[in-house]
């Protein structure tokens, strides 16, 4: 045990431990930085103090906690995300957002794919959600890909510590440059791609002949629709479901109208949910949760009888759900509570279910089911505010009363200003300085 190792030998002992992890099997091969402690030149005595403090932690404090190491690992990932820049923080998706996506697509069995898996957080939080719903995470086969080397290693360690079997490919590389799961299609997809990614269209994309699901090549200026079409191509044709986040601009970009029209007319888009601002640590923008579904024909699904809802899209606007600010964080942030996640999912499930009339399914300022004809008249825009009714509260304003009160307040301010002007002039005059 490290606690018994003298300070003078501790650096070597820790590096030996890293080497042992490297040699333990293929799961963590290439994940650890060998000779790390030697290279960073930490003072042996200081390192010994840290080891001694860690050894004071008693597992008894955590009771039956089975995932202590995993929780500690996640804590440090989150701490780094809090202090990271926008680009650095892309590897981490807050747990409440993952829970929302999982609640909508219910990845309880089969295969789960994330084409930009970051540190593996989607998989971890999804596993927790499945277990909380009395599901068996061993029935879910995880597939992912990540282009950043350090983040790829974080993901492998993160999943290994949780005992989650995974397939992340042979190494880090962009999904667009090389699909390491070519030929495979999946039951579920969850993803949080980098928002508005530029410079994604490389010569490798052209040479690989990426499958855009027969929708044509997406704009090179922005990867949003490249992600959409890639994920659509990776869904099982008869039942695949995807839930992913994109910047709000993807809802109505002029240069993607043709692709968006085809997605809508082919009945691939099931729901569009605009989320509150400040859900992320590294950006305060509002983003959208997209739900794609290869089967809107109805039937039994996870114990629910679904109606045929082809020709409809459910729009939801959750931007006002900001009543839960996270206290104690260095950056302003809000989160979605479990009851809010459930409420949003219930709205979605009711809309899908037998007995619901999609033509009238609506609640002002929150959600509305919309048919293709109305989408067509709006040039296939997917911006929820185009369709959800918002109450014009200005109609209830007594403008005469408001303006009268405003005029009275301005008069008082002007009168007070005159009084202050006289007082200031008199004060200066008494000092021998007179204002002209």
Label for each model-derived stretch:
Residues 1-108, 166-168, 172-180, 274-277, ...:
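Non-catalytic, mostly N-terminal accessory regions of nucleic-acid modification and defense proteins
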Residues 178-187, 194-372:
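Signature of N6-adenine DNA methyltransferases within the class I
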Residues 46, 64, 93, 147, ...:
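Generic detector of ordered secondary-structure context
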Residues 62, 132-134, 280, 305:
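Generic marker of residues within folded, mature protein domains
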Residues 87-191, 196-214, 226, 246-249, ...:
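Conserved S-adenosyl-L-methionine
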């Amino acid at each position: 045990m490290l606690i018994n190792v003298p300070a003078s030998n501790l650096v070597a002992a820790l590096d030996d431990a890293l080497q042992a992890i490297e040699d333990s099997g293929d799961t963590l091969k290439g994940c650890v930085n060998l000779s790390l402690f030697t290279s960073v030149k930490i003072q042996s005595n200081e390192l010994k103090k840290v080891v001694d403090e860690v050894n004071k932690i008693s597992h008894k404090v955590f009771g039956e906690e089975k995932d202590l190491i995993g929780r500690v690992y996640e804590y440090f990932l989150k701490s780094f995300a809090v202090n990271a820049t926008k680009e650095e923080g892309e590897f981490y998706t807050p747990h409440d957002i993952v829970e929302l996506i999982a609640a909508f697509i219910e990845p309880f069995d089969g295969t789960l794919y994330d084409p930009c898996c970051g540190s593996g957080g989607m998989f971890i939080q999804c596993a927790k959600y499945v277990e909380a719903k009395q599901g068996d995470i061993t029935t879910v086969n995880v597939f992912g890909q990540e282009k950043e080397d350090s983040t790829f290693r974080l993901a492998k360690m993160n999943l290994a510590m949780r005992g989650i079997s995974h397939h992340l490919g042979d190494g880090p590389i962009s999904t667009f440059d090389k699909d390491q799961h070519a030929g495979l299609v999946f039951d579920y997809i969850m993803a949080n791609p980098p928002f508005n990614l530029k410079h994604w269209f490389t010569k490798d994309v052209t040479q690989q002949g990426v499958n855009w699901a027969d929708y044509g090549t997406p704009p090179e200026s922005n990867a949003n629709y490249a992600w959409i079409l890639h994920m659509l191509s990776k869904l099982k044709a008869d039942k695949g479901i995807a839930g992913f986040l994109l910047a709000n601009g993807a809802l109505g970009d002029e240069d993607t109208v043709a692709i968006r029209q085809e997605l809508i007319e082919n009945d691939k888009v099931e729901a569009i949910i605009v989320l509150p601002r400040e859900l992320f640590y590294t950006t305060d923008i509002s983003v959208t949760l997209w739900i794609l579904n290869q089967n809107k024909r109805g039937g039994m699904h996870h114990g629910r009888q679904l109606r045929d809802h082809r020709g409809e899209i459910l729009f939801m606007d959750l931007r006002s759900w900001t009543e839960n600010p996270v206290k104690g964080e260095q950056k302003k942030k809000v989160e979605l509570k479990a009851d809010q996640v459930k409420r949003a999912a219930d709205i979605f499930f009711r809309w899908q279910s037998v007995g619901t009339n999609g033509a009238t399914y609506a609640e002002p300022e929150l959600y509305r089911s919309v048919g293709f004809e109305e989408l067509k008249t709006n040039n296939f825009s997917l911006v929820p505010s185009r369709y959800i009714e918002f109450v014009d509260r200005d109609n209830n304003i007594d403008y005469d009363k408001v303006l009268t009160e405003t005029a009275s307040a301005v008069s008082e301010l002007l009168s007070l200003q005159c009084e202050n002007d006289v007082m200031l002039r008199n004060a200066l005059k008494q000092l021998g300085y007179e204002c002209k």
